[in-house]
């Protein structure tokens, strides 16, 4: 398996100013080890030695996740500074409510991922993506992203959208195209903590309305054409889809207390803390599917999701069904 970058997701904090109803980043307020710089250094030094069987990579990327990691700006800066000094590529996932907080050090970040499920205020309130009744609007997000790009012209922008019972009818693809993002990841809500996921109908309805790669602007049309010509599975796609099966046991994740953890079961499975054992030993204590990991960064899973959607709506049985049309009941905003 040849991949350029291995990505490790460190959920450094559980604290968040939103209360998303489907959130899986719950650890019942465990001790967060990033409050101690020595622990942060131990974790990062441990991660530097990561090796995966039959997997070659040239770069390690630390993806800082929460909770909402941006809320504790100074502490976040200390982690980023330390990771940068150890030659990690650095990315971050945020709900976007305080993107301005990372402006002083965004030049050290290669990718900012923003979790956006809707641009409709009422929908976001129903989901729990609000703080004291305030939600982020499309125009606010656009302006914040433009400011970050001004400070770091090479910054990649990714949007993560979780398809759930409140937003499955919305058409977001045109707004995403207007933002000129580098990647749009569409994820299916995971069953977790006694909460059910969403039905095949709802997930496939969202895909039918939004899985339209042709609408997304490309940074480099020529390289995209050449990649598509030589290897269709590696073309420069912007939209990536992750169904529940693709999302399970395919991420390398660290909990706030420093343990590797893995999904795919009714409860998380954990390793011993990375402050106590090596990363190799920790990987032996959890299930991690390297093939799934690799496939998430290609578009195999996306093509499969598209095929399943077409099959679900019996589109392959009728030649006159056009995948390019939009359902009439989408978001009007």
UniProtKB/Swiss-Prot annotation:
The keyword Ribosomal protein does not apply. It is an enzyme of class 4 (lyase). One of its GO terms (molecular function) is lyase activity. Residues 1-239 form the Radical SAM core domain. It catalyses: GTP + AH2 + S-adenosyl-L-methionine = 3'-deoxy-3',4'-didehydro-GTP + 5'-deoxyadenosine + L-methionine + A + H2O + H(+). It comes from the Bacteria. Its EC number is 4.2.-.-. Signal peptide: none annotated. Gene3D superfamilies: Aldolase class I. SUPFAM superfamilies: Radical SAM enzymes (SSF102114). [4Fe-4S] cluster binds at residues 16, 20, 23. Pfam families: Fer4_12 (PF13353), Radical_SAM (PF04055). Belongs to the radical SAM superfamily. Viperin family. PANTHER family: RADICAL S-ADENOSYL METHIONINE DOMAIN-CONTAINING PROTEIN 2, S-ADENOSYLMETHIONINE-DEPENDENT NUCLEOTIDE DEHYDRATASE RSAD2. Expression of pVip56 in E.coli (strain MG1655) confers resistance to phage P1; has no effect against T7. Catalyzes the conversion of guanosine triphosphate (GTP) to 3'-deoxy-3',4'-didehydro-GTP (ddhGTP), probably via a SAM-dependent radical mechanism. The modified nucleotide represses transcription from T7 RNA polymerase-directed genes (possibly by acting as chain terminators), strongly suggesting these nucleotides block viral polymerase transcription. How this protein allows bacteria to resist viruses that do not encode their own RNA polymerase (such as lambda, P1) is unknown. This is S-adenosylmethionine-dependent nucleotide dehydratase. The lineage of its organism: Bacteria, Pseudomonadati, Fibrobacterota, Fibrobacteria, Fibrobacterales. The gene is vip56.
């Amino acid at each position: 398996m040849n991949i350029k970058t291995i990505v490790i997701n460190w959920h450094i904090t559980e604290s968040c100013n939103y209360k998303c109803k489907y959130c899986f980043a719950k650890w019942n307020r465990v001790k967060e080890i990033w409050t101690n710089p020595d622990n942060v250094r131990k974790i990062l030094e441990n991660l530097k030695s990561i090796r995966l069987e039959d997997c070659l990579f040239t770069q390690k990327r630390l993806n800082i996740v929460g909770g909402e990691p941006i809320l504790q700006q100074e502490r976040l800066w200390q982690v980023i500074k330390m990771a940068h000094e150890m030659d990690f590529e650095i990315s971050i996932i945020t709900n976007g409510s305080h993107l301005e907080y990372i402006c002083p050090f965004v030049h050290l970040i290669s990718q900012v991922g923003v979790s956006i499920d809707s641009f409709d205020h009422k929908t976001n309130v129903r989901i729990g993506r609000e703080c004291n009744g305030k939600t982020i609007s499309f125009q606010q997000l656009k302006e914040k992203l433009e400011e970050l790009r001004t400070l770091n012209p090479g910054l990649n922008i990714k949007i993560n959208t979780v398809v759930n019972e409140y937003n499955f009818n919305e058409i977001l693809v045109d707004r995403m195209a207007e933002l000129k993002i580098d990647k749009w990841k569409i994820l299916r809500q995971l069953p977790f903590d006694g909460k059910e996921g969403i039905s095949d109908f709802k997930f496939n309805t969202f895909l039918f309305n939004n899985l339209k790669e042709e609408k997304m602007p490309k940074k480099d049309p020529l390289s995209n054409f050449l990649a598509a010509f030589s290897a269709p599975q590696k073309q420069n796609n912007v939209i990536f889809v992750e169904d529940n099966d693709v999302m399970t046991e395919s991420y390398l994740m660290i909990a706030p207390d420093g343990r590797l953890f893995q999904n795919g079961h009714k409860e998380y499975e954990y390793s011993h803390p990375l402050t106590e054992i090596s990363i190799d030993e920790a990987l032996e204590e959890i299930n991690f599917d390297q093939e799934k990991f690799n496939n998430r960064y290609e578009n195999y899973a996306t093509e499969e999701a598209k095929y399943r959607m077409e099959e679900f709506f019996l589109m392959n049985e009728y030649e006159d069904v056009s995948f390019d049309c939009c359902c009439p009941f989408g978001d009007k905003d």
